[in-house]
């Protein structure tokens, strides 16, 4: 069958490596950007944001906790005359920046200070933030960064737990791709070979560098950043998160919703994805033991108990996971797992 016209946006300029933060002025000049709104966090990322502001012609800095999602939905008209929105910080900062850039129809510059997730380069925001926006009447947020600047020296200074979360995110891509192919074969879902290969390449970057990643430095940070950037571009090409988000993410999202409902502290996204991948590889009949071995080598948690979740919450989340995105077919099927099947998978893999 002949496909119709395809259109996707990818970042126009990507700069990463030591001292990349010093290239902000050069990037902005190249892109013709002058006036900007910089969204950032506190202390460390605020300091980095100041370095970014010094290289702008006219930039204002505000903290993400000063911004309510309801304000963003109303439009933030006070900033309608800026050329770009820059996110300088972690996951929430980058997500808030995407939402503002999307609502104001402005260019987005992504300047992450941690490498904990693939949102640093993708057009999409976190599941929970999108869920909150849906309740406010906002549709699917999609905003591809025009430029991405990652100073690997700065990212390497962040606590190792953030890098481990990024690695955990990348370990899950194998499952996402297996599920995507399954959905393509069984439900006729659109499938992009180029996006799939890019996501697989990102996964393999981690698998091929496990021994190196037992260390923590700029070189190891660069490996993870490069893989996360590849995932972001894969999602942009596919026009969805499908190349990088399968049943392992459905389970993680289900955990997030239940944790919020029951008032349980949520674990880091990448940690949940890594553990969820073990379960889904088991269900696929794939080599889940290899992932557990890698997680132990790198110091990632290998049980949900380590993440602070009790057995009942985890079982319930696994049983509900298929309901998160019913439009996406995965190894969980249309009806999900029975309690017996969920408990068996958790016990057989030893993650409970």
Swiss-Prot record:
Zn(2+) binds at residues 169, 249, 269. Pathway: Membrane lipid metabolism; glycerophospholipid metabolism. Keywords: Cytoplasm, Lipid biosynthesis, Lipid metabolism, Metal-binding, NAD, NADP, Oxidoreductase, Phospholipid biosynthesis, Phospholipid metabolism, Zinc. GO terms for molecular function: glycerol-1-phosphate dehydrogenase (NAD+) activity; glycerol-1-phosphate dehydrogenase (NADP+) activity; metal ion binding. Its cofactor is Zn(2+). It catalyses: sn-glycerol 1-phosphate + NAD(+) = dihydroxyacetone phosphate + NADH + H(+); sn-glycerol 1-phosphate + NADP(+) = dihydroxyacetone phosphate + NADPH + H(+). Pfam families: Fe-ADH_2. Binds 1 zinc ion per subunit. Substrate binds at residues 118, 169, 253. It comes from the Archaea. GO terms for biological process: glycerophospholipid metabolic process; phospholipid biosynthetic process. Gene3D superfamilies: 3.40.50.1970, Dehydroquinate synthase-like - alpha domain (1.20.1090.10). NAD(+) binds at residues 91-95, 113-116, 122. One of its GO terms (cellular component) is cytoplasm. Its EC number is 1.1.1.261. Catalyzes the NAD(P)H-dependent reduction of dihydroxyacetonephosphate (DHAP or glycerone phosphate) to glycerol 1-phosphate (G1P). The G1P thus generated is used as the glycerophosphate backbone of phospholipids in the cellular membranes of Archaea. Homodimer. This is Glycerol-1-phosphate dehydrogenase [NAD(P)+]. It comes from Caldivirga maquilingensis (strain ATCC 700844 / DSM 13496 / JCM 10307 / IC-167).
């Amino acid at each position: 069958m002949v496909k119709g016209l395809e259109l996707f946006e990818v970042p126009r300029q990507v700069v990463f490596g030591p001292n990349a933060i010093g290239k902000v002025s050069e990037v902005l000049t190249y892109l013709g950007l002058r006036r900007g709104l910089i969204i950032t966090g506190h202390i460390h990322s605020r300091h980095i944001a100041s370095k970014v502001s010094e290289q702008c012609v006219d930039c204002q800095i505000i903290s993400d906790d000063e911004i309510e999602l309801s304000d963003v939905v109303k439009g933030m008209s006070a900033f309608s005359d800026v050329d770009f929105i820059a996110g300088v910080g972690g996951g929430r900062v980058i997500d808030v920046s995407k939402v503002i850039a999307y609502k104001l129809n402005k260019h987005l510059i992504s300047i992450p200070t941690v490498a904990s997730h693939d949102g640093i380069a993708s057009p999409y925001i976190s599941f929970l933030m999108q869920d909150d926006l849906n309740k406010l009447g906002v549709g699917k947020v999609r905003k591809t960064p025009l430029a991405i600047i990652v100073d690997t020296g700065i990212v390497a200074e962040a606590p190792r737990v953030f890098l481990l979360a990024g690695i955990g995110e990348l370990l899950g891509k194998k499952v996402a791709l297996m599920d995507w192919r399954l959905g393509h074969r069984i439900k006729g879902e659109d499938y992009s070979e180029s996006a799939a290969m890019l996501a697989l390449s990102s996964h393999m970057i981690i698998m091929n560098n496990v021994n190196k990643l037992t260390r923590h430095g700029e070189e190891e940070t660069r490996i993870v950043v490069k893989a996360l950037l590849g995932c972001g571009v894969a999602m942009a090409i596919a026009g969805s998160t499908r190349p990088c988000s399968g049943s392992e993410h459905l389970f993680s999202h289900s955990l997030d919703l239940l944790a919020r409902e029951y008032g349980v502290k949520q674990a880091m996204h990448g940690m949940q994805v890594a553990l969820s991948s073990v379960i889904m590889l088991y269900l696929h009949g794939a080599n889940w033991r290899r992932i557990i071995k890698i997680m132990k080598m790198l110091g990632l948690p290998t049980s949900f108990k380590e993440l602070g979740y009790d057995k009942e919450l985890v079982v319930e989340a696994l049983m509900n996971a298929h309901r998160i995105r019913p439009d996406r077919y995965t190894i969980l099927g249309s009806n999900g797992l029975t309690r017996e099947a969920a408990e068996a998978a958790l016990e057989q893999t030893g993650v409970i």
